[in-house]
A protein has these predicted regions:
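Conserved acetyl-CoA-binding loop-helix of GNAT-fold acetyltransferases
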Residues: 83-98, 119
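Glycine-rich acetyl-CoA-binding "A-motif" of GNAT/NAT acetyltransferases
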Residues: 56-59, 116, 142
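Conserved beta-strand-loop-alpha-helix junction that forms the acyl-donor binding cleft
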Residues: 107-119, 135-136
Length: 157
């Protein structure tokens, strides 16, 4: 499956994807603004990368550098991408980001209650390296987060 990836600064489209009703509940916490009030960060250091299967938009990844070579990722794939295509897209995304940026390590945080996201991250080749207790508030409940990552040297083997 040949997917296309492109960096975007189309903040209207980015906002539409992230605030999609099937995505927003999974990427927001108790302190995130309401979807109608939320705006994406308009900063050159943040990479919003769209993914297409042919002409069909599957969603995006947001990459936020924590250092020059270690970038945190947030996944926002639309329902049309869920399942097989999402797993393929995630693996190809890692290849693309490593080939097109200075990033050498991708990391993410997954709230402990989100078993689907944890499985998705592991299926994408990420490995758990830690746990951040009591670090995420959702629906008035304090949750811990699994810490996962993948390195260029590991992913490209």
């Amino acid at each position: 499956m040949a997917l296309n990836f492109e960096r975007s600064q189309d903040y209207t489209l980015i906002r539409q994807i992230i605030t999609h009703p099937a995505i927003w509940p999974h990427v927001s916490d108790d302190y995130t603004p309401k979807p109608e009030e939320w705006k994406p960060a308009e900063n050159d250091s943040v990479w919003y990368v769209l993914v297409y299967d042919g002409g069909e938009l599957l969603g995006l990844w947001t990459f936020i550098p924590e250092t020059a070579i270690c970038w945190k990722v947030h996944t926002c794939l639309l329902p049309c991408a869920w399942g097989y295509r999402s797993r393929i897209a995630a693996r190809q995304m890692a290849e693309w980001i490593f080939a097109n940026t200075a990033c050498l390590r991708i990391i993410t945080d997954v709230p402990e209650y989100n078993r689907h996201a944890l499985k998705f991250a592991k299926d994408a080749g990420m490995h758990e390296f830690g746990y951040n207790a009591a670090s995420y508030m959702k629906n008035g409940i304090l949750h811990g987060q699994h810490l996962l990552g993948i390195s260029k040297e590991t992913q490209c083997q």
